A protein has these predicted regions:
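Helix-biased detector of long, well-ordered alpha-helical tracts
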Residues: 1-218
Length: 218
């Protein structure tokens, strides 16, 4: 016993619905390894999960992390968890637990992976889905702060093909490790003011493919 995490459900929501999301940061981890910089990758992890909650109108409640690693490195883990804590503070959700697995038979020296799991809550009438989107609605884009945590396999391929060393390029070094923006405050502010009918993360496929995912068939 004692391995489960318990949290309160807010009482001010009439018809509460739980929304769950899990994600990782993909091969951005390889950039962190190359630069030996691990204090922001945890922010990325939280962002990838909570940004998937808010597009359905849900307020993030809790977050859990999973870290699998070749060999436990306390300094590296402290930096990763520091980022996770910061991400949770930005998104106003509670870090309620996590798991660290030492797996030398799976990961080679210095290699690791991280995954996150988050649960949010939304009143049923405030859920953002296709049914609320209608003709003459405006499409508004919120600028990102960089490339977030998507497309890093392509980024790394381009770097390798062109023999670019990011350690020697200050601009690339800063841009490629920059943590994913957490959009919780902006989106939930729009939800609470009833100014938004639908929301979508613009990732692989760009504006065209992603916006189409939330448009009703009619």
């Amino acid at each position: 016993g004692g391995f489960g995490s318990i949290t309160n459900i807010p009482k001010n929501i009439k018809n509460p619905q739980l929304v769950a999301s899990t994600d990782g940061v993909g091969t951005k981890i390889e950039i962190a390894n190359e630069l030996n910089k691990f204090d922001t990758i945890g922010i990325d992890l939280v962002a990838m999960c909570v940004n998937d909650l808010i597009v359905q109108g849900a307020k993030p409640l809790i977050f859990l992390d999973y870290i699998s690693i070749n060999k436990v490195d306390s300094n590296k883990l402290k930096k990763i968890i520091k980022g996770i804590i910061k991400g949770c503070k930005i998104s106003n959700c509670e870090l309620v637990g996590g798991e660290t697995a030492e797996m030398p038979g799976t990961y080679s020296k210095d290699k690791f992976d991280i995954a996150g799991f988050s649960v949010g809550i939304v009143d049923k009438k405030k859920i953002l889905d296709k049914s609320k989107i209608k003709v003459n609605d405006l499409i508004v884009g919120i600028p990102s702060n960089g490339i977030h945590s998507n497309g890093y396999s392509l980024v790394r391929y381009i770097l390798k093909k062109n023999k670019i060393k990011i350690k020697k390029n200050k601009f690339l070094k800063n841009e490629l490790i920059k943590p994913t923006k957490i959009y919780v405050k902006e989106i939930l502010n729009l939800v609470n003011k009833k100014l938004i009918n639908g929301c979508v993360n613009i990732t692989g496929g760009g504006l065209r493919d992603n916006i189409n995912r939330i448009l009703p068939k009619n």
